[in-house]
Amino acid sequence: MTPHINAPAGAFADVVLMPGDPLRAKYIAETFLENAEQVTNVRNMFGYTGTYKGRRISIMGHGMGIPSCSIYAKELITEYGVKKIIRVGSCGAVRADVKLRDIVIGSGACTDSKVNRIRFRDNDFAAIADFEMTLAAYQVAKQKNISVQVGNLFSADLFYTPDVAMFDVMEKYGILGVEMEAAGIYVVAAEYGVKSLAICTVSDHIRSGEKLSAEDRQLTFNEMIEIALESVLIGDQT
């Protein structure tokens, strides 16, 4: 057990899907897993373990922002032996060609956070996803005829940013989605020698003002979850 996870040793599978919202973790476990059992509930950050098509998989919320997700990712890796983490969450779009409900596979993640520089002795670390996990997710999407875009996310420290001009810079550099965690998870995974990936569904469009309801964010995004789960099965074959 840790200060943030009250699960016994062996409670988590080697692969964990991590949404930010603990209620989305509950929804994923109850909707997609067989024989799902809650294994942790500290601070109402729920974690579950069950099976998907016979494959043992866990679901664990990670909260909002790089500090929160870094704590949970680190403890899952070092205390519970997790080898692969897939963030499944929401993001905002800035580009006109990225629409509401589009799915983004984050091959890399930029950030304005200082956290990764602290880890990497004040140098920039290229926060990238594992290639095989990225490829597996892309292959699943193509097999299921689900439209996805692959490229850079931007992990922001501020949800309500005063620097709106930065959105123009993001668009210029081809950022597909703005969220708050991927860059942190990628670097925690790199630090401890495990694999990670972030798959996000566009819940807001920063330019147009379109957005999904809180209920939609919690209970939908099924295609993203299917891509993540099926990609685990493909990964087992490589």
UniProtKB/Swiss-Prot annotation:
Query: Where in the sequence is the active site?
Result: 204 (proton donor)
GO MF terms on file? purine-nucleoside phosphorylase activity
User: Where does this protein hold phosphate?
Assistant: 20, 24, 43, 87-90
* Catalyses which reaction(s): a purine D-ribonucleoside + phosphate = a purine nucleobase + alpha-D-ribose 1-phosphate; a purine 2'-deoxy-D-ribonucleoside + phosphate = a purine nucleobase + 2-deoxy-alpha-D-ribose 1-phosphate
| Subunit details | Homohexamer; trimer of homodimers.
Task: Please give the name of this protein.
Answer: Purine nucleoside phosphorylase DeoD-type
Q: Which organism is it from?
A: Haemophilus ducreyi (strain 35000HP / ATCC 700724)
GO CC term (a single one): cytosol
Pfam families on file = PNP_UDP_1 (PF01048)
Explain the purpose of this protein: Catalyzes the reversible phosphorolytic breakdown of the N-glycosidic bond in the beta-(deoxy)ribonucleoside molecules, with the formation of the corresponding free purine bases and pentose-1-phosphate.
Q: Name one GO biological process term.
A: purine nucleoside catabolic process
